[in-house]
């Protein structure tokens, strides 16, 4: 015959369970090995990092670690991020910003999406947009603006810090910098009688500069002043003749693309040769970039792409609202860039409600080639991101960094 347990015995048996349940806590993420935590955070969109950094000091330290960004690069989770700076009316150091657009968002109806993060950054010396180039997670600012300089400033987008890079072989003012195969090619920024110093290259791996033979470019190019998007009269010219070339800020099929007064040229880095590719220049484009070996530009108020076979600019279809909107329509893009295979456009609207202030707008556009001579654009994200004085120059520099 089984006898019931005494109450005291039952309490003695159950008591440890109660104590155990009261003292047990859910496992913490920080209890995991450091490598596992780092791998988890590296797979999360950087859009979430500002909020995650508020969780604890340990999270803040992890999210600021250079090793985390190295892991993101190794496992292929880096994301594009837009960096731009604005010049004030008094020509003081421009203010740098980073713009993060929330991923996987689309424009619906007639409204706009407000999911973005605009963060002011430490500034450096004044720069011209064409002398700024993105290399991985870093931004190189090359040469001087108003005065010549051989200096190179490098901004590390992971730590938000500036440092000095190796100086160029000669001092330059407002040169053009283009990245091709982990080398930065720099053109111009010299006087006409110094055309032998017109061209040099920086090897990112060895961190060294090397002058390139300028004579191979020919007088057609070297007689022009590299002054993109501006008309600059030559001193001493009685008729103030315009000497201008326009250099595409992106490589085209691994080559440098230059539009001069009469002809268009390409430079092949592999054998150091220049070649005339067109007798009819496309120099008049205002701003341009390259996406999947197709040139895109703001030309005659519209966003266009270049048809190489027909040698003509064609309008990107489907962007009528962007061009003709009554309040945010634009008379021309201030800057366009390749944003991870999509087109990002920055502009000031044609009309502005404020007397002394203007809004800076930004749009992300997906591109689709539907036929041999037709490319369509779809606005995936659009918003006013900043309000500035009217005297402020928009997009003094604009680059996309992978981070």
UniProtKB/Swiss-Prot annotation:
Residue stretches making up the F-box domain: 26-72
Kelch repeats: 138-182, 184-229, 248-294, 296-340
Signal peptide residue numbers: none
Domain of life, source organism: Eukaryota
Keyword terms, alphabetized: Kelch repeat, Repeat
Pfam families hit by this protein: F-box, Kelch_FKB95
GO CC annotation terms, alphabetical: chloroplast
Protein name: F-box/kelch-repeat protein At5g39560
Organism: Arabidopsis thaliana (Mouse-ear cress)
């Amino acid at each position: 015959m089984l006898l019931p347990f005494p109450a005291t015995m039952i309490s003695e048996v159950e008591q440890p369970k109660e104590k155990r349940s009261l003292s047990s806590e859910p496992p913490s993420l920080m209890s995991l090995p450091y490598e596992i935590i780092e791998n988890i955070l590296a797979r999360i969109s950087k859009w979430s990092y500002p909020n995650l950094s508020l969780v604890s000091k340990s999270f803040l330290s992890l999210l600021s670690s250079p090793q985390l960004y190295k892991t993101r690069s190794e496992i292929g989770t880096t994301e594009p991020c837009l960096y731009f700076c604005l010049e004030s009316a008094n020509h003081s150091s421009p203010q740098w910003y980073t713009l993060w657009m929330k991923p996987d968002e689309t424009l619906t109806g007639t409204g706009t999406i407000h999911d973005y993060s605009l963060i002011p950054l430490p500034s450096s010396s004044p720069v011209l947009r064409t002398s700024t180039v993105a290399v991985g997670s870093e931004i190189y600012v090359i040469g001087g603006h108003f005065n010549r300089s051989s200096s190179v400033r490098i901004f590390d987008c992971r730590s938000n810090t500036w440092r000095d890079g190796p100086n160029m072989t000669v001092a330059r003012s407002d040169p053009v910098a283009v990245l091709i195969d982990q080398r930065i090619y720099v053109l111009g920024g010299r006087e006409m009688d110094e055309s032998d110093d017109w061209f040099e290259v920086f090897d990112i791996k060895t961190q060294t500069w090397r002058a390139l033979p300028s004579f191979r470019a020919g007088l057609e190019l070297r007689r022009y002043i590299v002054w993109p998007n501006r008309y600059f009269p030559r001193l001493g010219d009685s008729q103030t003749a315009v000497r201008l070339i326009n250099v595409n800020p992106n490589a085209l099929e691994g080559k440098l693309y230059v539009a001069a007064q009469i002809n268009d040229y390409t430079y092949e880095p592999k054998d150091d040769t220049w070649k005339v590719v067109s007798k009819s220049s496309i120099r008049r484009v205002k701003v341009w970039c390259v996406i999947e070996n197709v040139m895109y530009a703001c030309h005659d108020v519209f966003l266009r792409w270049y048809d190489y076979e027909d040698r003509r600019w064609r309008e990107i279809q489907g962007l009528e609202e962007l061009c003709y909107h009554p309040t945010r329509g634009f008379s021309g893009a201030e800057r366009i860039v390749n944003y991870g295979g999509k087109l990002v456009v920055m502009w000031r609207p044609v009309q502005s409600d404020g007397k002394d202030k203007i809004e800076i707008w930004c749009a992300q556009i997906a591109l689709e080639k539907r036929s041999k001579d037709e490319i369509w654009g779809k606005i995936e994200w659009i918003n006013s991101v900043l309000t500035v004085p009217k005297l402020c120059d928009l997009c003094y520099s604009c680059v996309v960094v992978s981070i």
